[in-house]
Amino acid sequence: MTDAQDTRITIDLDALAHNYAALRARAGDAEVAPAVKADAYGLGAAPVADRLWAEGARSFYVARLAEGVALRRSLGDREATIYVLDGATPGSGEALEGAQLVPVLNSLPQVEAWNVQARSGRLRAALHIDTGMNRLGLRPEELKVLVGSFDRLKRLDVELVVSHLACADTPEHPLNATQLARFQEAAALLPGVRRSLANSGGLFLGEAYRFDQTRPGVSLYGGGPEGRPHPEIRAVATVEAPILQVRVVPRGESIGYGAGWTASDNTRVAIVAAGYADGVPRAAFPRGEVWFDGARRPMLGRVSMDLIAVDVTDCDAARPGAMVELFGANLPVDDAADAAGTSAYERLTRLTLRGVRRYVGGAR
């Protein structure tokens, strides 16, 4: 089998660097600490972090302990700060300390566990405050208990307090201002400790949300901060798949499982080697499109595991081996995601190892 038969994922590291620079300009004096969790949103944490380090990034965020250990190994002797959003989960202490990872502590038991881990010397930590998302994080009243009990923090160097915005992609949502006020109040209990609130969307909410550090993710990788294309953000990943066969479906006949689409006229159809096993959502039909031969072209029928059908009527360029763009430089990932009722986050992170990655613009 050759690469020409596979889904091809082209990752433009120069576009990544452009997006990082655009977000740094938005951040003002605040640090920009990239989120490279989920294998850098499906694009490869090692080469992505490598390029972002070259562009000036010195702090990174991952979700899982294993991601942090792998990133530390990838970065080698470079003195990056790697924050682990899961925090100090049961049994993780030795591995966190061994890889010099900084847990984002999410609960009083995690604080206590990390304090115990620090029995042989002080350890770095960040504290996560829940300001209204109601996932992970210390409630403000728990933070008050914590700062009032010196023993719980005596072995820890708390260097950062963070929270996470639930509705940053909707600037007018009232929860943004509510979370900002709660975060300001909570952070005031830890004077001198650096603060971090803004994700990708938060960077576009205004200066008040930036504080000392920002943590962009999806907008580094080509997704707009409000779930739609943004002029400051370039596509980083272009995903293509080959046409396997071109056929004419006669009027009155249907395509695919469940006979989900029926031809109203004789229709020239390309069968493309991409399906939900390659990250194309099953929900992409009936609104899904691809880019081929200079235009958007509709998907026809249900998405199957390995295949989609595309209308290529009056398109002479459609032939076996020709590559169809699923999203990327011509079809923004936000638009492709919206057509399937999902987000750029999901479209990117669902890219699978079945696709062949190719790095351009500064690859290792």
UniProtKB/Swiss-Prot annotation:
Cofactor: pyridoxal 5'-phosphate
SMART domains: Ala_racemase_C
InterPro entries attached to this UniProt entry: Ala_racemase, Ala_racemase/Decarboxylase_C, Ala_racemase_C, Ala_racemase_N, Ala_racemase_pyridoxalP-BS, PLP-binding_barrel
EC number(s) recorded for this UniProt protein: 5.1.1.1
Active site: 37, 257
Domain of life: Bacteria
Reactions this protein catalyses: L-alanine = D-alanine
GO molecular function, one term: alanine racemase activity
GO BP annotations, alphabetical order: D-alanine biosynthetic process
Enzyme class name: isomerase
A Gene Ontology term for the protein's cellular component: cytosol
Pathway(s) the chain acts in: Amino-acid biosynthesis; D-alanine biosynthesis; D-alanine from L-alanine: step 1/1
SUPFAM superfamilies on file: Alanine racemase C-terminal domain-like, PLP-binding barrel
Entry-linked CDD domains: PLPDE_III_AR
UniProt keywords, alphabetically: Isomerase, Pyridoxal phosphate
Modified residues (N6-(pyridoxal phosphate)lysine): 37
Record keyword Mitochondrion present: no
Ligand binding (substrate): 135, 305
Its biological purpose: Catalyzes the interconversion of L-alanine and D-alanine. May also act on other amino acids.
Family in the record: Belongs to the alanine racemase family.
Official protein name in the record: Alanine racemase
The organism of origin for this protein: Caulobacter vibrioides (strain ATCC 19089 / CIP 103742 / CB 15) (Caulobacter crescentus)
Name of the gene encoding the protein in the UniProt record: alr
